[in-house]
Amino acid sequence: MAKMHTKRKGKSSSTRPNRTEPPEWCKIGADEVTTITLDLWKQGVSTSEIGMILRDRYGVPDAKLVTGKKITTILKENNVAPNLPEDLTNLIVKALGLRKHLSTNKKDVHNKRALNLTESKIRRLVKYYKQEKVLPRDWFYKPETAEMMITR
């Protein structure tokens, strides 16, 4: 769960059902899900968007239930996985946008705070990914070189 940077309590959301096998009405097979996933990835669709497309267009409630593997695992097995996790990439893109905004609007204190909070999230996430050995031990976030990391 993410750190709350506010006094509010957050909002409730629904929980996913406890299932170990796909529902009977899901007629698509594991091979089809794998090929669809790889095709969508080649078109430039992110992993979270692949999951939503599988859900909305193909009626697959959860790719892991059908294939037994997560979408990123499918991509890793086919040697096309991204070098950075998607949530970290999204936070870095957000921080880059805030930095660009602050370069022209130097007195925008609210977005200075937003940048500070976003970069704190990035540092916490990097620390987690280093512990889980997703990122190498010598990897660290530098705002100056962040744009080059994202475009690679």
From Swiss-Prot:
Pfam families with a match to the protein in the record: Ribosomal_S13_N, Ribosomal_S15
**Keywords from the UniProt entry:** Ribonucleoprotein, Ribosomal protein
Q: Which GO biological process categories is it annotated with?
A: translation
Quaternary structure and interacting proteins, as annotated: Part of the 30S ribosomal subunit.
The record's section on InterPro entries has: Ribosomal_uS15, Ribosomal_uS15_arc_euk, Ribosomal_uS15_N, uS15_NS1_RNA-bd_sf
Family the entry assigns: Belongs to the universal ribosomal protein uS15 family.
Indicate what this protein is called per its UniProt record.
Small ribosomal subunit protein uS15
Where does the record place Basic residues bias?
Answer: 1-11
Q: State the organism named in the record.
A: Methanosarcina mazei (strain ATCC BAA-159 / DSM 3647 / Goe1 / Go1 / JCM 11833 / OCM 88) (Methanosarcina frisia)
Q: Where is this region: Disordered?
A: 1-24
User: Which segments cross the bilayer?
Assistant: none
